[in-house]
A protein has these predicted regions:
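Conserved acidic-Pro-Pro-aromatic motif
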Residues: 7-129
Length: 130
């Protein structure tokens, strides 16, 4: 099977990227760094902690990497997660923990929004961030 990176397509005008590749999210994003830096799209990822571990990375590493690219993190369930998400995503039951002690499921449907755009969210995201 032949694969290509996002960057290999040479896209120059991308507003939204959805990635749901059963644990391979880290590698898809790594292959799209130029696209992310040039286009600054909103990115939707489904992250499942056990799938991440299969590929030797942790969900919070991916989240931290996106924050380093100056993206804010938004959850459909919990709104903005800046400074809130602290899960190590290591436990066998794939549970994470929030600062306030609430447990969460191991799967996360997250939106990464460029910091410069977070006050002008696309309409489909405004439903999730109240």
């Amino acid at each position: 099977m032949t694969t290509r990176t996002l960057d290999s397509y040479g896209f120059t005008d991308v507003d939204f990227v959805k990635v749901d590749v059963e644990g391979y999210e880290w590698f898809v994003l790594q292959g799209g760094v130029q696209l992310i830096e040039l286009c600054r799209p909103v990115i939707q990822l489904e992250i499942v902690a056990p799938q991440c571990r299969k590929f030797d990375y942790r969900a919070e590493d991916l989240i931290a990497w996106m924050r380093d690219l100056d993206y804010r993190v938004c959850s459909k369930r919990d709104g903005w997660l800046d400074g809130v998400f602290t899960s190590s995503c290591k436990s066998d039951d794939s549970k994470g923990i929030y600062h306030d002690g609430r447990k969460r499921k191991g799967d996360m449907d997250l939106f990464f929004v460029p910091r410069e755009q977070h006050t002008q969210l696309p309409p489909h995201l405004e439903l999730f961030v109240q």
